[in-house]
Structures are given as C-alpha cells and as structure tokens.
Regions:
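Active-site-proximal mixed secondary-structure blocks
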Residues: 1-37, 41-165
Length: 165
C-alpha cells in the first residue's frame, strides 16, 4: 500500500459506499472485526477531513467502535464482493470473520486494515451520536427502521489514506 494525501484521492465514494460497499475494520483490547457497510459519507467537518459510517445499535461491531479510538474504512474491487457479502451476513459473536474470509490483517501505526483493499482510510474517531427515531423528518426513511433498530453515526478524522499497489 502506498500513502497519499486526502487531496490526491481519485475515487467515487457514492459508488464506493452504495454500490460496491466497504468494510469498517476495528480492533479493541480483545478482538478484531470487519463489518460490511453500504451507508457512509465523506466531507469536511470542524475543518477536518472526515468520514462518517453508520452502524446499527444491534450489531456486534458497535461496542468495538464505542471502545476504540481508531478504525479503518476499506474499499475493494468487485472480485472481493463475495467476501464482503460474507462479512456483512455473519456475526463476530460466532466466529473470527476476518480469518474465515481469508483476508489479510495488516497495520498502519497500530490501526488494523485489510491488505486486499484498493483504498483504505485510517480514521481517528472524533464524534459519535445515536440517531433518534423521533428526529426523522422524511417519513420514507422509516422503512429502514420497521424493527426499531436505529444507527449510531461514527465520525472519524481521516489521518491517513492508503491505496493498493
């Protein structure tokens, strides 16, 4: 992986999140996990380059993100679609998903990411907020919450950008 600056990124994040999906990768004192995400955002907040990811409050990954200062967001080529599908449908509660997926753990400044990613954002968590159901303004959004499982938004400062060789 090669490090580049945020301004050198040439990637369509709309497709990256929504069409191609991505992984949020996190490690706490006990274990690590990778979870497929299809909702996210990139932008500037508080004069920092940030990425926002959304995790349902019932997901095993949530407590790990709550307890971690850093995480990574990894984007992959289409050939990894089956692995992302697996990582999005299985729970770390039951198995070591990264090992079972045969993806390779690597580190950048003690932050875990996956070697096979074509683009990795190393994130320092700077804010998190639960999204309350009673604040939904567009009622069409409620179809995503029929079982009441809301999301937590995790906003991270992009501290490093890595691209595949």
């Amino acid at each position: 992986m090669k490090e580049i600056s945020v301004s050198e990124i040439n990637y369509n994040f709309f497709d990256g999140f929504h069409k191609d999906w991505a992984l949020v990768v996190v490690e706490d004192q006990k274990e690590d996990n990778a979870m497929t995400i299809s909702w996210g955002g990139i932008g500037i907040l508080w004069s920092k380059s940030v990425t926002t990811v959304y995790v349902r409050n019932t997901r095993y990954t949530k407590h790990m993100l709550d307890d971690s200062e850093y995480f990574s967001v990894c984007f992959f080529d289409e050939k990894y679609r089956d692995k992302l599908k697996y990582l999005g449908t299985q729970s770390r509660r039951n198995e070591d998903k990264i090992t079972c997926s045969n993806l390779t753990r690597v580190y950048s400044d003690d932050v875990l990411y996956l070697k096979e990613a074509k683009l990795t954002l190393i994130m320092k968590k700077i804010y998190q907020v639960d999204l309350p159901l009673d604040q939904v303004q567009d009622k069409s959004i409620l179809k995503f919450y029929q079982e009441g499982e809301m999301h937590t938004a995790y906003i991270g400062e992009v501290v490093k950008v890595l691209i595949g060789d």
